[in-house]
Curated annotation (Swiss-Prot):
This is Type 1 phosphatidylinositol 4,5-bisphosphate 4-phosphatase. It catalyses: a 1,2-diacyl-sn-glycero-3-phospho-(1D-myo-inositol-4,5-bisphosphate) + H2O = a 1,2-diacyl-sn-glycero-3-phospho-(1D-myo-inositol-5-phosphate) + phosphate. Interacts (via transmembrane domain) with ATP6V0D1. Interacts with LAMTOR1, RRAGA and RRAGC. A motif (CX5R motif) lies at residues 140-146. GO terms for cellular component: late endosome membrane; lysosomal membrane; phagocytic vesicle membrane; plasma membrane. It is an enzyme of class 3 (hydrolase). Its main location: membrane. It is a multi-pass membrane protein. The lineage of its organism: Eukaryota, Metazoa, Chordata, Craniata, Vertebrata. Residues 15-38 have a biased composition (Gly residues). InterPro entries: PtdIns-P2-Ptase. Its EC number is 3.1.3.78. It is found in: Late endosome membrane; Lysosome membrane; Cytoplasmic vesicle, Phagosome membrane; Cell membrane. The gene is Pip4p1.
Length: 284
């Protein structure tokens, strides 16, 4: 009975809505009202369910991104924020960009396209940069007037013109003489003022003599020495002809003297046939 009392308020509330609160539940799930009619005791379908959640309120209408009749904004490609942070320079030869990140401590960097050097810093004190027509970057003294390209296929002499150093410059202007090579007829600078007037041309890499005095003197000395040895060998041969037949070691002495005479005469021929390079101006 206690259980029926606990359930009664629920039934009475459902019945009060349709029969005034005095009806009883029948076996078919219906309650009998005062007038004898059957009234449904169960609530209508959907009455016991929770109400569906309401939708979110609509967003307030704002201005459109592009107004009618207005051009869209210009296109800008998305780039990485680090793409423009790396320091770049332009190659002085092929105009290609060169990334110098991590190379700022160097004076020059090498281009990855043309493999030529491009300076990124000023030259060291007392030096300057010079670019050869073959695109080779050279570094030389600020007082240099002529330099030679070190590349084997170039070997070009670059005339830098007169340089007037300041009064505080500790490096004197190089002294020398312009010489026309006796082999290739090119002009180069000769700066070795010694008794040996032999010079190697930077163009053809051949040795020649500056003037005729040095090779002529060497030729005369070698010729006279060779002539003296030849006369000595002849006299030795005639003087020791009979003893040489008994002692075979005398033939070795003949051969040694004759060999010295041939070497001296050959050296005299070398100096006599040496090419001569002529200077085009006096020593400065």
């Amino acid at each position: 009975m206690a259980a029926d009392g606990e359930r009664s308020p629920l039934l009475s509330e459902a019945g009060d809505g349709g029969a005034g609160g005095n009806g009883l539940a029948g076996p078919g799930g219906s309650a009998t009202g005062p007038g004898g009619g059957l009234t449904p005791s169960a609530p209508p379908y959907g009455a016991g369910k929770h109400a569906p959640p309401q939708a979110f309120p609509p967003f307030p209408e704002g201005h459109p991104a592009v107004l009618p009749g207005e051009d869209p904004p210009p296109y800008s490609p998305l780039t990485s924020p680090d793409s423009g942070s790396a320091p770049m320079i332009t190659c002085r030869v092929c105009q290609s960009p060169i990334n110098v990140e991590g190379k700022m401590h160097q004076h020059v960097v090498k281009c990855g396209v043309c493999n030529e050097a491009t300076p990124i810093k000023n030259a060291p004190p007392g030096k300057k940069y010079v670019r050869c027509p073959c695109n080779c970057l050279l570094i030389c003294k600020v007082t240099s007037q002529r330099i030679a390209c070190p590349r084997p296929y170039c070997k070009r002499i670059i005339n830098l013109g007169p340089v007037h150093p300041g009064p505080l410059s500790p490096e004197p202007q190089p002294m020398g003489v312009r010489v026309i090579c006796g082999h290739c007829k090119n002009t180069f600078l000769w700066t070795e003022f010694t008794d040996r007037t032999l010079a190697r041309c930077p163009h053809c890499r051949k040795v020649s003599s500056i003037g005729r005095r040095y090779p002529r003197k060497r030729c005369i000395c070698c010729f006279l020495l060779g002539l003296l040895l030849a006369v000595t060998a002849t006299g030795l041969a005639f003087g020791t002809w009979k003893p040489a037949q008994q002692y075979g070691g005398i033939y070795a002495a003949w051969a040694f003297v004759i060999l010295l005479a041939v070497l001296c005469l050959g050296r005299a021929l070398y100096w006599g046939c040496m090419k001569v390079s002529h200077p085009v101006q006096n020593f400065s």
